């Protein structure tokens, strides 16, 4: 104890007033290290605290050292080594480290929670089922509310997932997939054709696809059949338009729009964002029908609401509904193209006229010749033909309305100086016709207008349609009628009412075609059957074959004395007239020898032979080429009816007529192709095979045989008359 108390105090290098307080310095260091983000300061404080503690332990152990012999004064503890202050500094440092660890753990937990929420949402959207959608229906509106859609043309419900298949199978009705090894096709199922390829041919791979060929037609039928559906079977409600900028860029499964949206951390939740987008899309879809809405003064007469089998009223937003009045604001009629394959003429020896294809080509045709319509009926000074809007497309006059703006004013000033313009004049003859039509109409004018607009043949009979077509004002006549200020004549008022019907001539022509199509098709069928009977009779007639062989024998024996008929193998029946008039070396004509043989040969049935004359006379004045031309005319009228149906909107009776007309026309074309093949075989049978570069004269074989039979019959009758006269003269 004496040694410890007498130990000398360590000398100080600084004066007492200038030495800094160790407690103050250490306190400042500790206070600087309490920040949870200053990690370097906390590390330095730990090192300083460790060194100070080691020094304190060494100082406390010094008095107990028995080897120290030097005496020193009593040891006084500096303020730095105050136990309370050291414990305070250590606790502050420990709290700073714990705060840093807790902060980093919270960050990691938040990231994990966000990732788990995203994964759960994606998994729920991918694995959702009808039961889950029903349970969540109270919380949010279903994204796919319509399970079935109503087909306007078929008038039945179709499942929403089967809309394109329904279009391809029921309306387009064209082979979409074909087996590459055979003619097996399917209108909608690719798997059926693949199964056929594997099971019957052992082929792997995909079948031949025609989907792209009929894609445009499928889209057009989609608009007609399901006017309240957008895209590939997607209802308008709760769905974004395919062209909307908010639509996902990648096609995904149903209800996967949320998964395609980028996640935004610490900004807006995904549910809020999806709800906002969905609300915006619903508002846009609800506002869309009101964009092009036009006032219709006849809404009380013609309702603007359509009902379907789902007991849902659908607003008739289709532009074709209740639009039979002409829209004066439309300056141009949209271009109408009638896609169909080019029909080859009957003179082509290699191929037959192909049946009409209304949607397999993009080549526009002109089924209306210039002057057939749009020709003014009430302007006698115009004796030249006028083109309609369809015929004007692609001509030198196509851009006249835009290019003549610079010259129109100058031309108008020069013409206005004369003050002489064409006016509407109702001649006496036309006035009589209009009065007769008005007297035959038993309904009011607006009912006539609506019947023409709907092309309703149940309201207007065929004679009335023909009469209305005769007096219907064209576009030029309508311009003059509208300029008239005072219309006191009821006939002029009746004509002015007809001018308000859009495409009135085309609609009346369509109704006329609907009336006359069955009769014309039946007439064509009868003509084809008459030719088929003539071909069959000539091909199977035993008497005709014997006569041709007798002529061949006469030529061989009469000219070459060849009783085995080896010199001349045969001849063309087309030359039979010149052959019969040829004289043999004996001075006898071939016809005289043949007539003598026919009279003496009892095995030949002359009644059967000359009975062919009655069959051939039935087609003597007909022409096979006219059958093909009549079929083409009917097809053109069907094209006009189909285009008018597309322009006027959905019309179920007209749609059924067009489909039926296409089917019947296809059958008649097949019938005609079969007839042409039979005529070609008959031509070969009669010894007139044609090379590929020579055209077939389908009427020649029948005329040649008919002339030969008439000549033989006349010669036999004359010979019989001369024999009777000789018998009468020689008898007593």
Swiss-Prot record:
TM segments?
A: none
Q: Tell me the null mutant phenotype.
A: Double RNAi-mediated knockdown with sem-2 results in no sex myoblast production.
**Which regions are flagged for Low complexity bias?**
1-12, 19-45, 121-137, 240-251
Molecular function via GO = actin filament binding
Q: Which residues form the FH2 domain?
A: 355-732
Q: Report, as the record phrases it, the tissue specificity of this protein.
A: Transiently expressed in all mesoderm derived progenitor body wall muscle cells before they differentiate.
Task: Cite the residue spans of the region called Disordered.
Answer: 1-45, 121-141, 232-267
Q: Which GO terms describe its cellular component?
A: cytosol; nucleus
- Kindly give the InterPro entries that the UniProt entry links to this protein: FH2_Formin, FH2_Formin_sf, FMNL_animal
Q: Which UniProt keywords apply?
A: Signal
Q: Does the keyword Signal apply?
A: yes
Ranges of Polar residues composition bias in the record: 256-267
Q: What range does the record give for the signal peptide?
A: 1-27
Keyword Signal carried by entry: yes
Q: Name one GO biological process term.
A: cell migration
Q: What does this protein do?
A: Acts redundantly with hlh-1 to promote body wall muscle cell and coelomocyte specification in postembryonic mesoderm progenitors, probably through suppression of sem-2.
In which family does this protein belong, per the annotation? Belongs to the formin homology family.
Which PANTHER family did the record assign? Answer: FORMIN-HOMOLOGY AND ZINC FINGER DOMAINS PROTEIN 1 (PTHR45857:SF8), FORMIN-LIKE PROTEIN (PTHR45857)
Question: Can you name this protein?
Answer: Formin-homology and zinc finger domains protein 1
Per the UniProt record, the source organism is: Caenorhabditis elegans
Starting at the broadest rank, the lineage of the source organism is: Eukaryota, Metazoa, Ecdysozoa, Nematoda, Chromadorea
Q: Which gene encodes it?
A: fozi-1
């Amino acid at each position: 104890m004496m040694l410890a108390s007498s130990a000398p105090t360590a000398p100080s290098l600084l004066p007492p007033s200038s030495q800094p307080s160790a407690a103050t310095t250490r306190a400042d260091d500790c206070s600087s290290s309490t920040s949870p983000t200053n990690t370097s300061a906390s590390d330095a404080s730990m090192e300083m605290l460790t060194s100070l503690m080691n020094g304190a332990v060494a100082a406390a152990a010094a008095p107990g050292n028995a080897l120290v012999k030097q005496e020193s004064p009593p040891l006084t503890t500096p303020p730095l080594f105050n136990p309370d202050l050291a414990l305070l500094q250590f606790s502050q440092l420990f709290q700073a480290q714990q705060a840093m660890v807790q902060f980093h753990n919270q960050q990691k937990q938040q990231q994990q929670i966000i990732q788990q929420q995203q994964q759960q949402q994606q998994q729920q959207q991918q694995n959702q089922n009808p039961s889950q959608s029903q349970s969540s229906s109270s919380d949010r509106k279903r994204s796919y509310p319509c399970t079935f859609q109503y087909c306007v043309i078929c008038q039945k419900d179709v499942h929403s997932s089967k809309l394109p298949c329904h279009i391809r199978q029921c309306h387009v009705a064209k082979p979409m997939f074909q087996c590459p090894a055979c003619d097996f096709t399917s209108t909608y199922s690719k798997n059926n054709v693949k199964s056929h390829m594997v099971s019957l041919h052992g082929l792997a791979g995909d079948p031949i696809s025609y989907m792209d060929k009929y894609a445009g037609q499928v889209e057009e039928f989609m608009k007609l059949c399901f006017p309240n559906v957008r895209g590939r079977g997607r209802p308008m409600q709760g769905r974004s338009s395919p062209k909307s900028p908010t639509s996902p860029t990648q096609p995904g499964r149903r209800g996967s729009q949320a998964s395609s949206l980028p996640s935004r951390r610490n900004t807006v939740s995904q549910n809020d964002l999806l709800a906002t987008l969905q609300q915006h899309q619903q508002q846009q879809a609800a506002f869309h029908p009101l964009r092009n809405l036009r006032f219709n003064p006849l809404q009380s007469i013609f309702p603007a609401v359509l009902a379907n089998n789902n007991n849902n009223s659908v607003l008739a937003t289709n532009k074709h509904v209740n639009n039979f009045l002409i829209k004066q604001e439309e300056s141009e009629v949209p271009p109408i193209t009638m896609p169909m394959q080019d029909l080859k003429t009957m003179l082509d020896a290699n191929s037959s006229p192909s049946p009409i294809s209304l949607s397999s080509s993009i080549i526009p045709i002109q089924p209306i010749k210039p002057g057939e319509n749009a020709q003014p009926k009430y302007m006698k000074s115009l004796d030249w033909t006028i083109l309609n809007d369809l015929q004007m497309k692609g001509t030198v006059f196509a851009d006249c309305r835009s290019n003549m703006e610079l010259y129109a004013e100058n031309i108008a000033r020069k013409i206005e100086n004369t003050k002489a313009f064409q006016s509407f004049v109702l001649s006496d003859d036309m006035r009589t016709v209009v009065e007769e039509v008005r007297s035959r109409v038993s309904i009011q004018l607006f009912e006539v207008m609506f019947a023409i607009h709907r092309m309703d043949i149940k309201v207007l009979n065929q004679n009335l349609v023909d009469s209305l077509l005769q007096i219907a004002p064209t576009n030029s006549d309508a311009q003059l009628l509208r300029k008239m200020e005072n219309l006191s004549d009821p006939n002029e008022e009746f004509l002015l009412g007809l001018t308000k019907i859009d495409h009135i001539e085309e609609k009346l022509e369509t109704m006329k075609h609907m009336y006359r199509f069955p009769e014309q098709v039946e007439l064509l069928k009868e003509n084809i059957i008459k030719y088929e009977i003539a071909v069959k009779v000539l091909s199977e007639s035993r008497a005709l074959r014997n006569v041709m062989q007798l002529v061949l024998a006469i030529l061989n024996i009469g000219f070459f004395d060849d009783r085995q008929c080896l010199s001349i193998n045969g001849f063309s029946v087309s030359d039979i007239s010149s052959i019969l008039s040829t004289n043999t070396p004996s001075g006898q004509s071939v016809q005289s020898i043949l007539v003598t043989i026919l009279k003496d040969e009892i095995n030949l049935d002359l009644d059967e032979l000359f009975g062919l004359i009655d069959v051939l006379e039935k087609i003597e004045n007909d022409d096979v080429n006219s059958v093909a031309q009549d079929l083409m005319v009917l097809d053109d009228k069907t094209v006009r009816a189909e285009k008018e149906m597309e322009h006027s909107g959905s019309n179920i009776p007209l749609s059924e007529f067009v489909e039926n007309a296409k089917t019947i026309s296809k059958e008649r074309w097949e019938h005609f192709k079969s007839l042409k093949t039979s005529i070609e075989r008959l031509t070969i049978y009669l010894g007139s095979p044609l090379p590929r570069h020579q055209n077939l004269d389908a009427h020649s074989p029948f005329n040649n045989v008919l002339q030969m039979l008439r000549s033989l019959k006349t010669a036999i009758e004359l010979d019989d008359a001369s024999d009777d006269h000789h018998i009468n003269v020689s008898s007593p």
